[in-house]
Amino acid sequence: LKINSCKASILTKAINTPYDISGTFYDVGEGIAYIRIEGFDKSVKYRVEQLLREFADFEVDILEMAESKNFWQNVNDLDFLKEIEGDLWRVSVKPTDGSRIIEMLDPNIGFLDWCGGLVWLRVDEGLNVREKMQKVEGHAMCLLGGFDQFHPTSTLEKKLSNSIRNKFDPKMLFNQEILN
């Protein structure tokens, strides 16, 4: 389903229905929510009908199978972010905080996944998302840009992480570049 002219909070409303939503995505710039429903034809048809009733106050489009498959593949491949300039960030927060992150950062482009708990951002080069989101609990990874990829960890977290890593990979054979 494609729900036009809506706020990100609609994802929470959708996921809290009993209609077994399998995926959500929100385009911040366009104000469009996408909801994925999967399963057997009869079940999908019933759940779509119920969701259309649930969102009767909105303009809702039903994506055909090929269009839907293509859209969700583009989401998976992050095609929405490829042509946009700026640093690429992946921010994990409580679903209710996803919209706050967008408001705080005013990104070049932003998308919410995981019902708002995963925020994909392209921001101006050099903007430190971690500094800007200090009032929001979460974790930010810089995937393309001039910052460390992983969120800084405390001394205790580093100690715990190293202890676990040493138990599972004592010879340090796996992910040497990432984990060092």
Predicted features, each with a name:
Residues 1-85:
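C-terminal substrate-binding/cap subdomain adjacent to the FAD-binding core in PCMH-type
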